[in-house]
Amino acid sequence: MAINLSTIGVRLYYGVEVTAGERPTSGYTRIFGIKSTPSLNPAPDTIETTTLDELEYKTYVDGLKDLGGALEFTFNLTEELITRWDALMTAYETAKASGLRMWFAIVVPGLTKAFYFAGNPSSMGLPETSVNTVLEITNYITPVSAPVKADKTAEMTDSVSL
């Protein structure tokens, strides 16, 4: 029987390739304060193949999937997030200058595998503010690879630190 899972304890990590083109298998750093992650499960485009022989329905074949450009990750804006995102951006710029990519991992407690994708993060800006609300920010990561499921690394254990 399947065990239903909760979003409690979902975590976001980043790591830099050691060898160009290969997802890192260790050395990931956690980013705290995540409130929401985007869907990495887009519907494929459909390509119409209907001919004049069809009398009632159009026909299609699957096309490419589109993650939609820059992915939105929502965080509580804290001094710790600013420090960690600045460190992430420094690591990204260093990796980019060396011809290496940055990888991101979304870890769900209770699943044996994590969800990985290579991406280019954007610098953090100033979020919208309004009266009597939690200060949140949306940070952006543009995917440069298809998402993959793979085993969690050692630093991605299911223990949830509060």
Please report, for each region that a protein language model flagged, where it lies by residue.
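Intrinsically disordered, low-complexity terminal/linker regions enriched in Pro/Ser/Gly
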Residues: 151-162
